[in-house]
């Protein structure tokens, strides 16, 4: 699937159920691996990234059986992981590498973690510093992977994140489960996704959550999970964006996770005038879930400020496209974190959208988009640069443009959503 051609669509119509949430699936496999007994996971979001987590915890001594989107994890116990004698390969999964490092800080032995070329460019000093303060020995390669960690007797800390990052927060909180008496506290400059806190609480760990701060207390054991994973909001977002932009669209998405730390994209779309309704609200696996209905409408420009960024960081590429078809100029501020994702997403977004006719100007911490409320010209070839979010952005751009778009490196969607293109075609009306 190295190249995919996406033809313009008249509208999107249909009902969809997107795969289980990747972030929550990672956590279910990882925490199930150190729980007592057997954890059962249904509607798991199986992709290249989450399969890396399965392979990693197997290498460390847990047992995992996977069949379709169902999985059983037989945990090794809270301190039962063992160094396999060779590096643990995290593939492209930054969530896995950072969260696993927090868990390994509480294990006996010396562990080495490696990743692919993309993951090896992403910063790791941001987890090495707090874990070192807690008593673990963490060595990076000039601030990147490969990484080695040697667990030790951990002491609780109060740590203020220099940058809002759910992965760093989760790493520190997971290490806090292994610390000596007293809470480990993480203070955030802006709210980030709280899946780790919710799952730990459901497994019997004492957790305190309040605005801008999360704390965990040490535990002797983790209770096994029995969880149905909500649909991945970030996988739903491309369909939401396209349906918002294509006149005549009527789209329903069932069983989507609507955790408020993840749905900033909906908040921003509503501010722009979008018609997105959430109904049948419920709770699954300790997470809020709902069904979404989306219809097309005219949109107006808006500004996304730094405090909002963590709640839609994965959707900001899509926001750039939506903003390009709105009335007026839209701005994203305080999104420097985009530069250290699977690609430099600020530059990648510009390189995809500008040749298609979207007027976008980049800055160090974001971008400005000059909206024109009509279809961009499209056409040509764009490079997904090995980044699944950029491939999905290019696909949506192809749907809403006047001319077809060719996407090179389209196979990168397999990192999070292997069936993305098939699902997209199933609802496109031409």
Q: Where do the language-model regions lie?
A:
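Structural preference for solvent-exposed beta-strand-turn elements
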Residues: 1-430
């Amino acid at each position: 699937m190295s190249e995919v051609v996406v033809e313009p669509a008249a509208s999107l119509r249909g009902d969809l159920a997107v795969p289980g949430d990747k972030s929550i699936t990672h956590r279910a496999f990882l925490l199930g691996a150190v729980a007592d007994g057997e954890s059962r996971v249904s509607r798991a979001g199986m992709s290249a990234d989450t399969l890396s987590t399965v392979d990693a915890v197997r290498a460390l001594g847990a047992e995992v059986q996977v069949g379709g989107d169902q999985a059983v994890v037989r945990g090794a116990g809270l301190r039962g992981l063992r160094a396999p004698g060779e590096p643990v390969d995290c593939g492209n999964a930054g969530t896995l590498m950072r969260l696993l490092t927090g868990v390994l800080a509480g294990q006996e032995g010396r562990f080495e973690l490696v990743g692919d070329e993309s993951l090896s460019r992403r910063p790791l000093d941001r987890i090495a510093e707090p874990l070192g303060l807690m008593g673990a020995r963490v060595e990076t390669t000039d601030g990147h992977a490969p990484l080695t960690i040697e667990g030790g007797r951990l002491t609780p800390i109060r740590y203020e994140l220099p940058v809002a990052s759910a992965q760093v927060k989760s790493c520190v909180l997971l290490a806090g489960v292994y610390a000596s008496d007293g809470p480990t506290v993480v203070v955030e400059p802006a709210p980030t996704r709280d899946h780790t806190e919710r799952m730990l609480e459901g497994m019997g760990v004492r957790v305190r959550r309040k605005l801008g701060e999360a704390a965990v207390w040490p535990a002797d054991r983790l209770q096994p999970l029995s969880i149905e994973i909500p649909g991945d909001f970030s996988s739903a977002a491309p369909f939401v964006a396209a349906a918002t932009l294509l006149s005549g669209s009527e789209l329903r998405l069932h069983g989507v996770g609507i955790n408020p730390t993840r749905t900033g994209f909906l908040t921003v779309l509503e501010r722009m005038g979008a018609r997105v309704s959430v109904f049948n609200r419920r709770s699954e696996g300790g997470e809020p879930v709902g069904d979404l209905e989306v219809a097309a409408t005219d949109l107006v420009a808006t500004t996304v400020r730094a405090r909002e960024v963590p709640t839609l960081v994965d959707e900001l590429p899509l926001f750039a496209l939506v903003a390009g078809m709105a009335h007026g100029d839209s701005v994203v501020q305080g999104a420097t974190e985009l530069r250290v994702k699977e690609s430099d997403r600020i530059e990648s977004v510009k390189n995809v959208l500008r040749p298609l006719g979207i007027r976008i100007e980049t800055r160090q911490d974001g971008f400005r988009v000059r909206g024109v409320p009509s279809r961009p010209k499209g056409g040509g070839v764009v490079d997904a640069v090995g980044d699944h979010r950029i491939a999905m952005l290019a696909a949506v751009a192809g749907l809403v443009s006047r001319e077809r778009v060719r996407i090179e490196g389209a196979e990168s969607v397999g990192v999070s959503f292997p069936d993305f293109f098939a699902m997209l075609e199933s609802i496109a009306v031409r």
